[in-house]
Amino acid sequence: MRSTGRSHGPRRFLALIALPLALAVSTPGLASPSTDNAVAPDRSSTGEQNGVGLMRIVVADKSGIDRLNQLGVDLAEYTKPVDNGIEVHAILSPEESQALRDKGFDVQDAISDQGDYAQNMAERAAAIRAATATTAATDTLTVLRAEWFTSLDNQLFLNIEVKSSAGTDSTTVLTASWDGGPGTEIGSGGTATMSRFTDAGQYMYHRFSNPVPITAAPVKATITSNKGGSATVDVAKWLGSPRKNPGKHPYVSDFVDHYMDPTEVTARFTGLAAEFPRLTELIDLPYKTNGYRRQAQAQFGTAAASTVYVTSTAYGSEGGNDITVSLVNPGTTNAPLTVSVSGKAVTVRLATDGSGAITSTAAQVVAAVNGNADAAKLLTASTYRGNAGTGVVAAAPVTMLTDNLKAPASVSREPFQMKVLRIGKHRDGSKVGVFLYCQEHAREWVTPLVCVESAERLLRNYAKDPNTRKIVDDLDIFILPVVNPDGAHYSMYDYNMQRRNMTNYCPTSNADPGRRNAWGVDINRNFSVGSVFDGYVGASATSCTSDTFAGPNELSEPEARNEVWLVDHFPNIKLSMNTHSYGGYFMWPPGAYKAEGREVLPRVDQGTEAYFWTSSDYILSRVQEYRGTAIWPGRTGPVTDVLYSAAGNSADEHWYNRGIIGWDFEVGADIYNPATGRFSAVGFQPPFAEGHEEAMEFANGNIAILEVARAYATDKIQPKTSLKVVKQEVGATGFTFSTSEPANVYYTLDGSRPTYSSPKLALAGMREGVQNITVNSDTTVNWFSIDIAGNVESNYKPDGQGSNYNKQRVAVQ
């Protein structure tokens, strides 16, 4: 993948706010300089007055999301279809919210992530435009999914997804009706209009905006179109039954009781390694992070043209916080502008005219400070956000520089040593490896708890729980609890909505202390597959203050390189799970597309897609068994199908470069309120009581992933297939294959021996079943299948000379 050098193009969206307004926000700190130099950041924590909020935005379609990304808006990894478009969530200050409204965006109410949840935006009834029945062509309906499921408090829901052959016409309206259970009529259970889902201007399929609450599990559903099409299908149950009681030995769980910072999490893992040396080892990853540290700064001035800020050469923790700067009025006439240094005290004596008035401009002060060799060893001076600096500066008292960091002394200011806890009885590379990793995004406080809880359960249940013992004995498990430790510390103690790491690539025009909450690289946009540097959507390569800033080039960040090092150094890793929040998603590759023509990264083949879906049913059933949370079918699937494009994400990196089967959790499913009939989002940092429950249920999911991995590792059963004729008419016969388990089918139609180079059974389309193959004359079909674990049907050797493949003649009338 190509990389580019350091780039400092258009500034982040917040820079679009008028400069005088930005200065007005920080005026109190500028007008009254003090020894603590309290400069208000442009973006303050949610809990502060005029701080950022988690805001709803409704856009018409995915192109609106792409535009928000291009503007550098800080979007949550959350989307929800609504009747008039797509709802997304963004971290915005009041000024940023208004600036987006001025640009025509529908910025709506705030979602509290501190416990007081706002209701979801009101759904308006779908307007069905009448179509002339006599002129409308009858469309064909393909039902993609029809399922019912239960969630919290045993509330039942219905999910249906249908593709219409006339779906590209925005006037196509689909209506679903269902029965009320066995022996009841279609329609007795309810009727609902479906929403038309488009992405990047292309029709995808129709679905419900939200799963529909129902009172009884339906058996069948009928979908009708205003274009004349109709289809009736069976409604299946989504997710399985509860796990059986493990036996007389109680399964122990619940090992987290508060949100933990990365220092605490690492100490917990270090303690586990010491307590269980026979089953674990700690791996020090090779690339230390930049660390929870910043240069110290001070800012002087009340207007853009006369403002100067200084930045220490050393980090604040390494002496930068000991530097002082003063701007002195000499009190004499015709004084020259001079700079002097005594120890770590920098004194700027401002120039005056014949009347004794100060004449030094901001640009002149900057040049004088930077031109003084002794001062330049300590700090650099800059004008405010690229201003020419023609305004006259004001005198200021001795001011101490500060790095503005608030974490306690227990949080080191040195580069952070990331550690992986390796768990397994046999840690020699002979067992299938599974990589579980959490908190790529700093503000997602629940996610490291999922990794901690998973590790604790594996080790503390090993002695007495047979299922846990099988997992640990048969797998090689790698758990990285915090991918982004610097950003996570910053989120915990300085700015709760920090998403990125703390590395500042901004030029001086965006490096003043007011910008300090807008620096860093999005780790989950810094990988090398499907990246913004290759033209994919969902990250910024030019705005260093964008919350999806991908960095100066692919894999520029040590956090991302550590992930790559781990999976390269341990090639036995075959499966992975990346835990994020929020929204209740379960996803897999592909995760990115190019905007032009919605060019998606290559989709996985049908055998792998079937494996993802089959595994999902098992994994999500384990999530559900904790307290009833059901991950919606509409939030399950490839990232590009159910969320949006996320250029340069880690799951794509590991799948396309190494073939690692990887999933993404988004913990924190929306909570249904039966009193209001609405779903409420939980946010990044819910009250701990809710965060605890999310950690418990998704730790269940992690254990289930390990069970799936063990089944993969121990699978010696060969798949079985059969050829099924699905359609016969004069001159043509359509057929497909059915398999006993997720498997790829290779076939020939010319009588030749099938090999891995032969045509492979494909999917009929996005979220559809397998394709139908049509022949126009009597044809001998030869085929074999291979499952995900590599077992070949009938022990056939595709690269050999044997003939023990399947054969069947398909007749044509």
Please provide the spans of the model-predicted regions.
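Secretory targeting and sorting signals
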Residues: 2-34
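M14 metallocarboxypeptidase catalytic domain recognition
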Residues: 32-309, 315-320, 349-736, 755-780, ...
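Short glycine/proline-centered coil/turn motifs in the loop regions
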Residues: 739-741
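A short aromatic-rich beta-strand->coil structural motif
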Residues: 745-748, 783
